[in-house]
């Protein structure tokens, strides 16, 4: 798979209030995230999901936000400081070869990979890194945009997820996306 990186300016579009109305992050995340959890947002961009996660995990929780683009992470950090949530958030820049989360092995309660797996050069390695970071029984909300990824393409990614050890718990309805809840 070739590397496609979301242009930085698209990060601002992803934060659109219209997107929030159509794809409400709180409604999507509330069934899975509780106070005190450690949550990984892999492919965080400017934090459309990260800031709501930080509110949901509360003061005793922790959100690890990882993205390939330093500018995206810097923008998210500014937004987190402005929202007063930066104390419960960690910001990391990864590389095309590593998600940079090896130190999290077995410590993450829940993870998100929203509209990102189709952009990484090695989806299997990406999913394996998330699997390793999760605690036993931990979950991954995996979603890809239907406009970029076909149903067959998403099923291929689910096969990769199974190959690294994930179990598919259920599919999810998220507007214009192929989505599933996976578990370790």
Task: Please provide the spans of the model-predicted regions.
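Conserved alpha-helix/loop element of class I SAM-dependent methyltransferases that forms part
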Residues: 19-35
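A short SAM/SAH-binding and catalytic strip from SAM-dependent methyltransferases
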Residues: 108-121
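Class I SAM-dependent methyltransferase SAM/SAH-binding core
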Residues: 40, 46, 51-99
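A short acidic, Gly/Pro-enriched loop at the edge of an enzyme's catalytic core
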Residues: 37, 97-111
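Conserved beta-strand signature within the Rossmann-like core of class I S-adenosyl-L-methionine
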Residues: 137-144
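Class I SAM-dependent methyltransferase Rossmann-like catalytic core
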Residues: 3-22
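Core SAM-dependent methyltransferase catalytic element
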Residues: 164, 173-184
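A short glycine-rich, Lys/Arg-flanked "PGG" loop and its adjoining helix->strand segment in the class I
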Residues: 124-136
């Amino acid at each position: 798979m070739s590397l496609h990186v979301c242009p930085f300016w698209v990060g601002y579009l992803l934060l659109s209030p219209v997107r929030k109305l159509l794809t409400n992050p709180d409604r999507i995340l509330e069934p899975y995230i509780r106070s005190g959890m450690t949550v990984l947002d892999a492919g965080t961009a400017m934090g459309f999901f990260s800031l709501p996660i930080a509110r949901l995990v509360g003061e005793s929780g922790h959100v690890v936000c990882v993205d390939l683009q330093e500018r995206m992470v810097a923008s998210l950090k500014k937004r987190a400081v402005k929202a007063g949530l930066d104390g419960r958030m960690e910001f990391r820049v990864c590389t095309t070869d590593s998600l940079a989360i090896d130190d999290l092995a077995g410590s993450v309660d829940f993870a998100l990979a929203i509209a990102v797996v189709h952009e990484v050069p090695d989806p299997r390695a990406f999913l394996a890194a998330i699997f390793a970071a999760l605690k036993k029984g931990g979950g991954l909300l995996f979603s890809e945009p239907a406009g970029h990824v076909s149903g067959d393409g998403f099923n291929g990614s689910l096969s990769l997820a199974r190959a690294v050890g994930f179990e598919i718990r259920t599919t999810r309805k998220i507007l214009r996306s192929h989505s599933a809840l996976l578990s370790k």
